[in-house]
Amino acid sequence: MFKKKKYTVIRQAISKDLASFVANYFMMQKQVYDTCRNARYFSPFENILGYYESKDDQIPNTYCAYSDIAMETLLLKCQPEMEKVTGLKLYPAYTYARIYKKGDELKRHKDRFSCEISTTMNLVHIHYL
């Protein structure tokens, strides 16, 4: 299917337990970042625990992290399955994780060349009231 349509859907690519673990980890990391930022433990320009990108054209003012170690580990775990499904030898480039807020919408877009083959994974879905 991938070669024909240039995409495929892999259901349950990781276990529910692993998805929950990684999602909880990332939400806790956001809480730590928010606490440290609000208490001024570090500069608002520090991004080691993630950041809120105000100039993001896609989803502004939403917590995100570039190349987080847990997400990089998840990328490597999923690589063999992605190679099997695509029939390609893949070379991991980077990860980018984001916690969407109510009203956030990621519109169809083109990323940089290193994202020629990408994976999008929804770890948890929270219904907003």
Spell out what each predicted region is:
Residues 1-86:
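Non-heme Fe(II)/2-oxoglutarate
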Residues 9, 96, 118-122:
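Conserved hydrophobic/aromatic beta-strand scaffold that supports enzyme active sites
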Residues 99:
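Conserved active-site beta-strand element of glycosyltransferases/polysaccharide synthases
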Residues 102-129:
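Catalytic core of non-heme Fe(II) oxygenases with the double-stranded beta-helix
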Residues 83, 87-88, 124-128:
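Short helix-capping and hinge/turn segments at secondary-structure transitions, especially at repeat
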Residues 87-96:
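A short coil-to-beta-strand element that immediately follows conserved catalytic motifs
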